Amino acid sequence: MSTHHSPRVVLVTGGAGFIGANFLLRMVPRYPDVQFVNLDALTYAGNPMTLQPIEDAENYTFVHGDIADGALVQRLFDEHDFSTVAHFAAESHVDRSILDPLAFVRTNVVGTATLLDAARRAWTTEGAIDPVAFRFYHISTDEVFGTLGDTGAFDETTPYDPHSPYSASKAGSDHLVRAYADTYGLPVVISNCSNNYGPFQFPEKLIPLMITKARDLAPLPVYGAGENVRDWLHVEDHADAIDLILRDGRNSETYCIGGRAERRNLDVVHTLCDLVDEALGREVGTAREQITFVKDRPGHDFRYAIDAGKLETELGWTRNHTFESGLRATVAWYLANESWLQAVMDQSYRDCVQTQ
């Protein structure tokens, strides 16, 4: 039986964050007949300025609130008759999870459970849930799989082996989603993605952090020797993959989304330095002089890589960005959007980067 899903009313959680906002900026104009309700707590990494291009769209509504607030979530399900949940909301910065793990458990585990149970209650009719009319899509991370050696890649069969409070909380939420599918027949899909980059990312993450510091010729902190390897995925390619999985993915399946762009952290920093120097008309190599190697992060996974073959083969997903073109465009975006950067570089940002 086909499980093609046609969303009518979509609850998007965390839609003011980096990935959720990029998803909404692409989907709201793409699907004018679909209603999108964005529930976001507007924590430090959520920025409503990002959503200004769609804030007056007839098919878009913003709700300020917490996914762990059961009464609020239930009220939204009662009011909006959601057919679909696209669950982005999460605490996601590993360093912060080490400092405050309970905040990650509350949002990533308790918040996910709250949403799952509201969906279960709202979508159950005479003891069953229509597997085509409804869908709960949980967006997750490759960090739940732990670390790789020099070879190999994560895929949908990789065992879970989380090493940080962040990845453990996301692993817990993944298991809850599958448990609701197995126990209650909730129609679910899950995706695990590699590291994202692109416009509107909060500048605590590696790429925007290094762009802003290289611009200012400030010290560029690199963990350990910079040998850790990440697989980089442009956020717009990720958003398009999510759209594809949301509509055509098979119920209870997991899809891995990756960029096939593995790079050592130090190599990424070197490239960013040179791109910033070039864009600002400085001698290439100037920003590299600010690289400072700092004590490695506890439990720092050595290497991530994603095999996205299932998504590419079954659903025909392709990427529109190479890492080289995407990184160049990302540098240009951050250098051109000073007002957006200033809006997020408040005390919460300064407190964050001072610890890095």
Language-model-detected regions and their locations in the chain:
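Short histidine/acidic/glycine/proline-rich micro-motifs that form metal-
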Residues: L42, N195-G198, N228-V229, R297-P298
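The catalytic Tyr-centered alpha-helix of NAD(P)H-dependent dehydrogenases
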Residues: P162-S169, P199, P203, I207, ...
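C-terminal substrate-binding subdomain of Rossmann-fold SDR/epimerase-dehydratase oxidoreductases
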Residues: V9-L11, F23, F36, G65-A68, ...
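Residue-level recognition of oxygen-bearing side chains
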Residues: L72, A103, V110, F202-L206, ...
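Short aromatic-enriched loop/helix-cap "lid" or pocket-rim segments at secondary-structure transitions
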Residues: P48-L51, L148-T151, Q201-E204, V235, ...
